[in-house]
């Protein structure tokens, strides 16, 4: 794994509506963007990024969470910087790895920040479905939920 370090440089969260307001058709979009790639040596590159979670309802913008940071990537740094400088492109395998690391680290941070701002978490919450069994369950027993 060529990712050597990962660090946050800026964490910003805003709620634009009152916490008591009810929203219709709330949609949460999250995005990771590489903003700059610079060469630190033959084998290392610095990758600056921005993660954004936008909260949109049908009638208003509800909130915004934005996280910026830096990744130290190890590999063919010259080739990565050359491709990025020429057209803002990374090789698909490198792009997948970098964006996966960004999302893996930023989404948990965004969940904590959303809780503090009284916004819904920027990930879907799993729904628990308890199957209905015919007949009456035994007294004092409850279904097991895994």
For each of these PLM feature ranges, what is it?
Residues 1-100, 115-146:
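N-terminal intrinsically disordered, cationic/polar leader segments
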């Amino acid at each position: 794994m060529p990712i050597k370090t990962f660090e946050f440089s800026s964490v910003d969260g805003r709620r634009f509506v009152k916490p008591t307001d009810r929203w219709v058709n709330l949609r949460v979009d999250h995005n990771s963007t590489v903003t700059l790639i610079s060469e630190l040596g033959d084998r290392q590159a610095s990758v600056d990024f921005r993660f954004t979670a936008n909260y949109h309802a049908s009638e208003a913008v509800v909130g915004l969470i934005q996280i910026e940071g830096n990744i130290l990537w190890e590999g063919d740094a010259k080739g990565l910087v050359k491709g990025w400088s020429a057209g803002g492109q990374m090789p698909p395998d490198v792009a997948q790895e970098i964006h996966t690391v960004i999302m893996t680290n930023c989404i948990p941070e965004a969940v904590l920040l959303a809780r503090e701002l009284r916004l819904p978490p920027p990930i879907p919450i799993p729904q628990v479905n308890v199957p209905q069994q015919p007949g009456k369950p035994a007294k004092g027993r409850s279904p097991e939920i895994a």
